[in-house]
């Protein structure tokens, strides 16, 4: 029963956050991948082994090296590299304080790549987490900021998050990143855990 209530609370909180985000979010965004197709391989708030997925995973046609685009004008506010988790990741923050997270990248654009390589050389470690100021690495909407990859994960895809001004994840599908879905869901079973 406790588990059921916790799950219910999380679902309601995420829905409320998504509705709040959609009400205050700008819709003038571009798709984060330079692809004609828009398919998901993972959805927002899917259960993932004891946690919820706070992003959408975008299909890259089983390839790496697809140009990844800045969805809004803003700046690269954070660069992370790790052999696991997000792998190579960029955080783009816009003027309104919204943050867009791109993870599992193969290669970063020149400016962020030079910044993270300098940090890696100075620390002697591959795993780095570099926070940047508003004027450090500005980007324009539609600019190529990276290439898609599979770092930190098994299969190639783009893990894409939208976070509000408080840093809370919101549903990207309600924030201008919708995909056309013409297949109605079919409920095959319902399971309740106690």
Positions of PLM-derived features:
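A short hydrophobic beta-strand segment most commonly corresponding to one strand
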Residues: 159-167
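Bacterial N-terminal signal peptides
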Residues: 6-16
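Surface-exposed, glycine-biased beta-strand/turn segments
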Residues: 19-89, 93-96, 125-135, 140-143, ...
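A short linear boundary/processing microfeature
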Residues: 46, 107-108, 164, 178
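Short, charged/polar, Gly/Pro-enriched secondary-structure boundary elements
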Residues: 12, 167-170
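A cross-domain feature marking catalytic cores of carbohydrate-active enzymes
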Residues: 104, 162, 189
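Positively charged n-region of N-terminal signal peptides that target proteins for export
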Residues: 1-4
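Short beta-strand-turn/beta-hairpin segments enriched in glycine/proline and small hydrophobics
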Residues: 54, 90-126
């Amino acid at each position: 029963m406790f588990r059921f209530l916790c799950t219910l609370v999380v679902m309601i909180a995420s829905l409320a956050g998504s509705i709040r985000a959609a009400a205050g979010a700008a819709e003038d965004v571009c798709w984060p991948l330079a692809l004609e197709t828009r398919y998901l391989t993972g959805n927002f708030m899917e259960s993932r082994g004891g946690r919820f997925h706070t992003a959408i995973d975008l299909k890259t046609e089983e390839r790496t090296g697809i140009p990844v685009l800045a969805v809004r004008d803003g700046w690269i506010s954070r660069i992370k590299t790790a052999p696991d988790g997000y792998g190579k990741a960029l955080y783009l923050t816009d003027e309104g304080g919204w943050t867009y997270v791109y993870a599992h990248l193969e290669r970063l654009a020149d400016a962020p790549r030079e910044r993270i390589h300098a940090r890696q050389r100075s620390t002697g470690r591959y795993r780095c987490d570099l926070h940047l100021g508003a004027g450090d690495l500005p980007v324009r909407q539609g600019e190529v900021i990276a290439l898609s990859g599979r770092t930190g994960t098994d299969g190639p895809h783009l893990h894409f998050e939208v976070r509000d001004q408080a840093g809370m994840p919101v549903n990207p599908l309600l924030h201008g990143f919708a995909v056309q879905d013409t297949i109605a869901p079919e409920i095959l079973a319902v399971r309740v855990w106690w």
